[in-house]
């Protein structure tokens, strides 16, 4: 999904690419904090505020990638890499992630959720200037504003406990406004996209290979 950022990412993008709010080529929306809803019985709304003089953002990943690749800061070669030995570089960020359960470079992590339903709805009249994280009977849902007068919804749940149909029903009942296709962000046509995922971590995130190159493991497949 990857739309939200932390405060330091905004500073880095400004320093490296000169990204600004007027041109906004990455289709960013302001993120002034994080609102946790219904996670506590005593306090239904817990707001994690950022310092008043700082700001994070939510971006469209597709446009953020395009902006960085077109920045002119480095040469870009497009291709499918299956063997890192074919890459001529001193430092390699391997963002392919773990695609093989027998991959000895990664180990699984326990996570109570392992699937997400993605959809889009129209934006509310009043602008949302923070990320919403809403507790649900099956897990939680992220609610993120976009620049296209839409809002992204991600209903996160455990597919081994909650069936897909039950999750879809609860999603539509709790967020009836999330009824449009996520296709503008991803190559999907259906209104609600189900995306299962696994949680894992690299046993050795940074290592030196036999050729003396620094390999940094990161990312998901």
Model-derived features: where do they sit?
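FAD/FMN-dependent oxidoreductases across multiple families
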Residues: 58, 147-149, 156-221
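Mobile amphipathic helical/loop "lid" adjacent to a hydrophobic cofactor/ligand pocket
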Residues: 36-72
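N-terminal FAD cofactor-binding segment of flavoenzymes
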Residues: 1-45
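Short secondary-structure capping/junction motifs at helix and strand boundaries
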Residues: 19-24, 75-78, 180-181
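Short, glycine/charge-rich beta-strand/loop segments that flank catalytic centers
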Residues: 26-36, 80-82, 187-196
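Glycine-/proline-rich flexible loop or hinge segments
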Residues: 1, 48-54, 149-154
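Predominantly flavin-linked oxidoreductase catalytic cores and closely associated redox partners
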Residues: 62, 66-176
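General structural concept
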Residues: 1, 9, 13, 17, ...
């Amino acid at each position: 999904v990857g739309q939200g950022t932390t405060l330091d990412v905004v500073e880095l993008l400004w320093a490296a690419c000169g990204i600004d709010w007027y041109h906004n080529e990455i289709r960013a929306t302001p993120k002034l904090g994080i609102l946790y809803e219904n996670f506590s019985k005593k306090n239904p709304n817990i707001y994690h505020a950022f310092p008043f003089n700082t700001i994070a953002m939510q971006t469209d990943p597709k446009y953020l990638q395009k902006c960085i690749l077109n920045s002119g800061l480095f040469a870009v070669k497009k291709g499918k890499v299956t063997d890192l030995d074919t890459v001529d570089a001193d430092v390699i960020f391997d963002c392919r992630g773990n695609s093989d359960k027998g991959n000895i470079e990664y180990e699984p992590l326990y996570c109570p959720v392992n699937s997400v339903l993605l959809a889009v709805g129209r934006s509310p009249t009043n602008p949302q200037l923070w990320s919403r994280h809403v507790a649900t009977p099956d897990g939680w849902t992220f609610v993120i504003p976009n620049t296209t007068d839409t809002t992204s919804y991600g209903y996160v749940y455990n597919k081994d406990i909650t069936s897909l149909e039950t999750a879809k029903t609860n999603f539509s009942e709790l967020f009836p406004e999330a009824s449009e296709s996520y296709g503008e962000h991803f190559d999907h046509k259906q209104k609600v996209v189900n995306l299962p995922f696994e949680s894992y971590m690299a046993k050795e995130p940074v290592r030196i290979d036999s050729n003396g190159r620094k390999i940094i493991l990161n990312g998901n497949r």
